[in-house]
Amino acid sequence: LPPLTNKPQQEVTGRTNPGNTVTINDAPAQVAQDGSFKGTVTLKEGLNTIIVEAKNAAGLSTRKLVTTTLDTTPPNIFIDDPGYLVDVTEIEVTGRVEPKSKVTVNGQPATVTHDIWKAVIKVNYGKNTVTVIAIDQAGNSNTATKDLLVYKRVIINLTIDNPVPTINGEPQAPLEAAPFISGGRTMVPIRFISEALGAEVKWEEITKGITITLGDTVIAMQVGSTTVMVNGKSYTIDAPPVIKNGRTFVPIRFISEHLGAKVDWDESTRTVTITRDFIP
């Protein structure tokens, strides 16, 4: 018998002297002419003691005790949260499992130390499914999954009176007009900033209207007007859109934040930094 199994039905085999009778847990076993015997036992969950007794024609008997453990419970699997993932192609995933289990993560063997498993996996932008399969010593298996999101980050830097912006540290083509401050608000070219954030910009020449669309967000504004509509809701901004050197400029914080970006201002360098994490 195996010392540990997940199969309740087990065959017990052995050999005794020819002519002996054998019982296994008081149930008669089949004994061949050469003394080999076999019988079937049904195990209960946990530790089982099997009593094999052989008796000769004179009535003398010999007993042997064999122990085996039945474990039919699949191993629990825990997957740790790897945290917020940005611009990564490879990550280490970790978790816990029943000690001495064999673990695979997305088909690759994981390292298991006592009850801690870990593995390095490849990831892509967007949703990634981590599939963990664990097989314990008894042969029971279990599967757990966890969806992870990997974001792409865009960082835009614009400096007041400097026409050269940067995106993720790379200088871009000079703008027709540099960012400037109006009414205490930093004004930036709407088309550049919107498209850099992944939005679509439409210009209506007759009404001087601007429509910015990003996913489910639609921002509508008009040159010279402090009223802005965001998904049909009206807002009032401090500085209206203006046209400078043939380009439309808008207050950066209002637009960026409604497009899901974070805006930071460095007074010492007069630089505005716009950061947006998104799923490509």
Regions found by a protein language model. Give the residues of each.
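Ser/Thr-rich low-complexity repeats and stalk/linker segments
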Residues: 1-151
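Primary recognition of N-terminal secretory signal peptides and signal-anchoring hydrophobic helices
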Residues: 65-69, 74-76, 87-90, 96, ...
